[in-house]
């Protein structure tokens, strides 16, 4: 059974600022991950300094990073933010 994806309004605004082809890829990756929770295929890892009671996770999708919570008891993935990865070329 797939997990439900919750995207708050502030994250929707972040998605609106991303070029369409990247936004589509990010949302497709999120949906694919929610269907099977395949951590390796979608490059999902626990954020290092996140609390053990409510760990945050990150997913890489191209040059973007998606931060989210996985609420297993409710079968929900709650997206916190979607940001562009900072590289040495960004000033």
Model segments located where?
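A short, well-structured alpha-helix characteristic of acyl/acetyltransferase catalytic modules
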Residues: 23-25, 29
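Enriched for short, Lys/Arg-rich terminal
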Residues: 2-4, 9, 13-17, 24, ...
